[in-house]
From Swiss-Prot:
It is an enzyme of class 4 (lyase). Coiled coil: none annotated. Belongs to the ADC family. The lineage of its organism: Bacteria, Bacillati, Bacillota, Clostridia, Eubacteriales. This is Acetoacetate decarboxylase. Catalyzes the conversion of acetoacetate to acetone and carbon dioxide. Keywords: Decarboxylase, Lyase. It comes from the Bacteria. GO terms for molecular function: acetoacetate decarboxylase activity.
Length: 19
């Protein structure tokens, strides 16, 4: 589950500016 979210964040970090 975490890998899926990390992959999405790397592809579209704009979606999760939490980082």
């Amino acid at each position: 589950m975490l890998k899926s979210e990390v992959s999405k964040q790397i592809s579209m970090p704009l979606t999760a500016p939490a980082f």
